Amino acid sequence: IDGVLVGGKAADGNLFKKNATYGVKDDSAYIAIANTSGLPQTLIKNPLYTSTYGMGEQIKQALNLGKKNIYLFLGGSSTNDCGAGMLAALGCKFFDENGEQFIPVGGTLGKIASIDDAEMRKSIEGVRFTALCDVKNPLLGKNGCSYVFAPQKGAKGDDLSTLEENMRLFYEKTKYLRVDQNFDGAGAAGGTG
């Protein structure tokens, strides 16, 4: 690519701030989820509690640099949050049934009662995103990310069915986007695909 590395503070999978880098060249940014929410960077390994928020922070940094093409490398994550943390970092607001705003993780995706994505949509207007992954797993089902990859990230026993159900509820809550979200590769990086 022949670009340069830039960076700043971004959250790891446990939402602890750390230094993290990503690549830039011309009007493009190249961001790997493994640099923020990767398994090696995450101290407490359990996808019920890990977040993609740091990747969203890096995207926001790239947007502030004027980057209009964002390439997301989705491999090696510690997460199973459907990218909700990333969306929250970009300005998407998630509310529970009491109207309290929160940042969803794999264990709380099912608690989302409403979503306000207006601020996020405005922040990414005119930006092209390309997600790159090396898996073909869908979001849901026995071949989906919860059952196939969550055990590698620290999930055990009933965690798998909890993660799957929360992911299904998130899928239902985001159908207003009118986009099929259960395609091959959607399960990459804990549903961030």
Please place each PLM-identified region on the residue numbering:
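N-terminal loops that bind phosphate or other acidic moieties
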Residues: 1-74, 78-193
